[in-house]
Amino acid sequence: MWIGVISLFPEMFRAITEHGVTGRAVKSGLLQIECWNPRDFTHDKHRTVDDRPYGGGPGMLMMVQPLRDAIHAAKQAAGDGAKVIYLSPQGRKLTQAGVTELATNQKLILVAGRYEGIDERVIQTEVDEEWSIGDYVLSGGELPAMTLIDAVSRLVPGVLGDQASAEQDSFTDGLLDHPHYTRPELLDGLAVPEALTSGNHEVIRRWRLKQSLGRTWQRRPELINNLALTDEQESLLAEYVREVRDSVK
């Protein structure tokens, strides 16, 4: 997968190109990340990339020309088929379903804004989609861009050593992940659930599904309400709810 990034701080992306899962993906050639800095497309000695907004108000906006030229350079490097995404709190909220959708693209260009944002005409003429990672304000689009890259790259075949890791992550099936345990089997009086040490794969599968359903019901009930549960899921969730209510009587 190829990802181009437009950012005034391209050095920030070393965090994902040199470390962790994404760093290994870059080193193995499964993921390619290239950055373009709008400052490299300025024509004045101060390398100016911001200007005052029309109509007044606080803050500055990223200038059209350097930003647009940087996007054009990224498009030229990408070739045909690259989707341009602007990271913005006004965009579509990123969910696992959205990550899966974005992962179907072989080429993405991510535009990380700064200051008070970018000129609306750049969005109208250069951007295909706007995406947000949440209803809060950050200093720039770099962290959202890195979040998107990390999430999407996990779905690229071969990036994870075990593809089941991606398939079992929280939200992949609309549910939160189940609890996980490793050695020792007994820690400060707390034991690993018997189901996980039973060696029975079906018992383990049902326990994990039940815990996933229950945890989602307790922590993110709106996710449960949006799902069409199978008969097995409904039965396991009812069992979980009953056990919780019995425990507080």
Swiss-Prot record:
Top-level class of the enzyme under EC nomenclature: transferase
GO cellular component: cytosol
GO biological process: tRNA N1-guanine methylation
Localization of this protein: Cytoplasm
Positions bound to S-adenosyl-L-methionine: G113, I133, G134, D135, Y136, V137, L138
Keyword Translocase part of the UniProt annotation: no
Family from the record: Belongs to the RNA methyltransferase TrmD family.
Function as written in the Swiss-Prot or TrEMBL entry: Specifically methylates guanosine-37 in various tRNAs.
Protein name as annotated: tRNA (guanine-N(1)-)-methyltransferase
Organism: Aeromonas hydrophila subsp. hydrophila (strain ATCC 7966 / DSM 30187 / BCRC 13018 / CCUG 14551 / JCM 1027 / KCTC 2358 / NCIMB 9240 / NCTC 8049)
